[in-house]
């Protein structure tokens, strides 16, 4: 890991004096990759509504194999981090809440945002643990289905405040 970082051993341990600091750094790197993908979508002006969820879908499906392998390693580090550090777990929960709030603000209903987020989480974990290896057709089918869900519900930005509750007769 030290060699891949390009730092000296002393510099590495200066930035990450504890295992918890290293795990937090890895978590920050993973969340930064997602944030950068979203920002790129915003800057290029081609993003339709629900751009944050669309960016997460792109992150899961459109990266070359080498980048996906790097993401796999980061996801594995995140799993370890969440298991070993309450601070990493708290940051992960906060990042998930923020992602769901962003999707809601972009016009995606709560249920759809949760389904997409949990499907992507499951896909990332399945790839990370190597318990799933989708063939190209299956990957494309999953990707298309997630986009269909986004398209079906992302019509207008959500209002701030309490979520709309369905009324029953």
Functional labels for PLM-detected ranges:
Residues 1-21, 25:
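Helix-turn-helix
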Residues 17-21, 25-28, 43, 47, ...:
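Residues in soluble alpha-helical coiled-coils and helical-bundle/repeat scaffolds
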Residues 28-34:
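Short, basic, alpha-helical segments at the C-terminal edge of helix-turn-helix-like DNA-binding modules
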Residues 37-74:
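Hydrophobic alpha-helical connector segments
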Residues 56-60, 75-79, 116-123:
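Short alpha-helical scaffolding segments that buttress acidic/His motifs in well-ordered protein cores
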Residues 68, 86-93, 97-169:
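Hydrophobic/aromatic-rich alpha-helical bundle segments in the mid-to-C-terminal region
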């Amino acid at each position: 890991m030290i060699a891949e970082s390009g730092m000296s051993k002393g510099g590495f341990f200066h930035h990450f004096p504890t295992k918890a600091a290293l795990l937090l750094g890895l978590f920050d790197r993973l969340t930064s990759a997602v944030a950068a993908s979203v920002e790129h979508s915003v800057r290029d002006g081609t993003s339709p509504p629900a751009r944050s969820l669309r960016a997460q879908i792109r992150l899961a499906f459109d990266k070359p194999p080498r980048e996906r392998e790097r993401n796999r390693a980061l996801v594995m580090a995140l799993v370890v981090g969440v298991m070993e550090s309450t601070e990493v777990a708290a940051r992960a929960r906060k990042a998930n809440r923020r992602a769901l709030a962003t999707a809601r603000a972009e016009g995606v209903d709560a249920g759809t945002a949760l389904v997409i987020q949990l499907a992507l989480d499951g896909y990332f974990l399945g790839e990370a643990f190597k318990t799933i290896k989708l063939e190209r057709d299956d990957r494309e089918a999953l990707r298309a289905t997630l986009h269909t869900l986004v398209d079906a519900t992302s019509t207008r930005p959500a209002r701030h405040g309490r979520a709309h509750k369905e009324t029953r007769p």
